[in-house]
Amino acid sequence: MTYSRVLLKLSGEALMGTQGYGIDPAIVNSIASDVAKVVAGGTELAIVVGGGNIFRGLKGSAAGMERATADYVGMLATVMNAITLQDGLERAGVPTRVQTAIAMQEVAEPYIRRKAMRHLEKGRVVVFGAGCGNPFFTTDTTAALRAAEINADVVFKATKVDGVYDKDPAKHADAVKHAHLTYQDVLSGELAVMDSTAIALCKDNNIPIVVFNLFEPGNIGRAVAGEPIGSRIGNPA
């Protein structure tokens, strides 16, 4: 199966590479190169990016900030990442638009669903920033929401690991990777893939999720082509 319209979820942490903070330009360039090849092949691609490389709302809340305030700061961090991604993509020859859920007309378009879909149809990449514009919702949930809104075929969750494991592979040498999971497997097993709201949204709208390693060059293209990489979450076969 080749996917024609994809929602790619990138974590903020992925953008910082091996650094402890911020954005690694080499990672941005690598992502842009992979995305350019996918778009050149005719796939329509939208991106939701997190902000954890700059600020995490939950961490701010744990440190004493009001949760809603901390989440708004996190949303602004995602816009910094979105604009950086736009720059990298356009340098790679990919026409890109940033749309934000909080109006910032000097640097981005406001999120307008129909306009986003027209951009995709014209071969442009759309990067969604500022989460969904509301506190208490993660960028994973935003990815599921935007995927449903733009009628995406699939959500790609590109991470630092090559799939979903039964336990943390960084801590357990005997961790087993799941090739296929149902939405209910993830929800009932409380597997650390996406938060339960994001999984439930994908389940309700029958949007499959593919989890794979972002740092393996060409993996975005392999996932688009439907190659069996990473872990796939969906309805029972």
UniProtKB/Swiss-Prot annotation:
Alphabetized Gene3D superfamilies for the sequence: Acetylglutamate kinase-like
Specify one Pfam family. Answer: AA_kinase
Q: Where is this region: Involved in allosteric activation by GTP?
A: 17-22
Chief subcellular site?
cytoplasm
Q: Where does ATP bind?
A: K9, L10, S11, G12, G52, R56, T159, Y165, D168
Question: What cellular component terms from Gene Ontology apply here?
Answer: cytoplasm
**Activity regulation summary:** Allosterically activated by GTP. Inhibited by UTP.
What role does this protein play? Answer: Catalyzes the reversible phosphorylation of UMP to UDP.
How does this polypeptide assemble, per the annotation? Homohexamer.
Q: What is this protein called?
A: Uridylate kinase
Q: What is the lineage of its organism?
A: Bacteria, Bacillati, Cyanobacteriota, Cyanophyceae, Synechococcales
Gene from which this protein is expressed: pyrH
